[in-house]
Amino acid sequence: ELKVNFPVHNPAKWNTCKEEMNKLLPFLNGDYWNVEFRKETFDVQKAGLDKEYSVPFAQVSLLSGGLDSLIGALDFLKQAPKQRVLFVSHYDPQMHGPKGDQKDLIAEIQKIYSKQFADIPSLRVSLDRTNVSRETTFRSRSLLFLGIALIAAQATNTQSIIVPENGTVSLNFPLSPSRRSS
């Protein structure tokens, strides 16, 4: 069970969805969660954005390098030619495929839809300096993406976050009988 106390600017607002969070988080990674919220005293200074990120976006969308996110990206770009999307992604340096796939896909999408999107270069995520055994199931990828997407959406004042997922991952089958989801 994970018990986490999150610092937030408005704990009363977050407490209205605390029970939903405690139900949602286990679905995303299979662990049992107990979240609490406390008043954050640190004030985050908003930095100016590069020009390419200051143009409004209709949505922030995952571009993982996989087929589901590629189809989601192409569907949006084709169906909404006057709107822009901000692609976000992350990679684990131990897995060599996703980062290269993400770069290749961005390069190909750029050829046709260059004015309809921006991307935040794929963020490297790893636990290099830890003695904790390595997680090999990738069951937290969705949670990590949502965190990155929330930061990107807040920074660009974008209201919609899309996780294009159509396959078995979207069903989140448990990895073992002791898990509720993967």
Q: What residue ranges belong to the model's regions?
A:
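Metallo-beta-lactamase
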Residues: 64
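Hydrophobic/small residue at the entry helix of a nucleotide-binding pocket
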Residues: 68
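RNA-binding accessory domains that recognize and position tRNA/RNA substrates
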Residues: 1-61, 72-84, 88-126, 157
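ATP-dependent adenylate-handling ligase core
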Residues: 90-182
